[in-house]
Design a protein with these regions (language model features):
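Phosphate/pyrophosphate-binding betaalpha-module
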Residues: 68-105
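Active-site-proximal gating segment of KS-fold condensing enzymes and close homologs
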Residues: 1-36, 82-86
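Active-site-proximal alpha-helical scaffold in enzymes
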Residues: 21-22, 26-29, 34-70, 108-130
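Flexible, glycine/proline-enriched loop segments at strand-loop-helix junctions
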Residues: 7-14, 35-41, 104-110, 148-152
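A glycine- and small-aliphatic-rich helix-loop capping segment at beta-alpha/alpha-beta transitions
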Residues: 1-5, 55-58, 78-93, 153-157
Length: 180
């Protein structure tokens, strides 16, 4: 009864902690080494890739499975973003409502998905004859330090991230093939 406090399912804690998926993958495949969940909203997967890249170049691991997922399309997710007026109101034209880089944007479109990348130290990959799809040259991270939901009007945070990534990669802007 209530005199003993609320009753909890024995799986309450394991089901609520954010790194349970990473732990389950580790158990399923026998992966050892760094194992944790990155939590940084829309930047989580990119930050997870940056963490993996940094751990590999520091010699802390040879191979890391890195990625993320999102499943926010539920009453609390849609309701919360709607209450913040963060969602686009272009409901009459949903196929053109998403315009993240437009001056006339009026919010974002919710989505769900997930993905993983396997990052591997270059010489380790070459030694096993792996096909090399891409190389991470550098990473940059920064906060806008402007507003809870709006980007800085002059893009200062985005600019700083790109400058940090260029410096980290020791590259010039014209040498860049891809920006995430």
């Amino acid at each position: 009864g209530k005199e003993n406090g609320p009753k909890f399912n024995p799986f309450f804690i394991p089901k609520m902690i954010s790194d349970i998926a990473a732990g389950q993958i580790s158990i399923m495949y026998g992966f050892h080494g760094p194992n944790y969940a990155t939590c940084s909203a829309c930047a989580t997967s990119t930050n997870a890739i940056a963490d993996a890249f940094n751990l590999i170049r520091l010699g802390k691991a040879n191979v890391i499975v890195s990625g993320g997922s999102e499943a926010a399309i539920a009453a609390c997710g849609v309701g919360g973003f709607n209450a913040m007026h963060a969602l686009s109101t272009r409901n009459d034209s949903p196929e053109t409502a998403s315009r993240p880089f437009s001056a006339s944007r009026d919010g974002f479109i919710m989505g769900e998905g997930g993905g993983c990348l396997v990052l591997e130290e270059l010489e380790h990959a070459k030694a096993r004859g792996a096909k090399i799809y891409a190389e991470v040259a550098g990473v940059g991270r920064s906060a806008d330090a402007h507003h809870l939901t709006a980007s800085h009007p002059e893009g200062l945070g985005a600019k700083l991230v790109m400058l940090n990534a260029l410096e980290d990669a020791e590259m010039k802007p014209e040498e860049v093939d891809y920006i995430n």
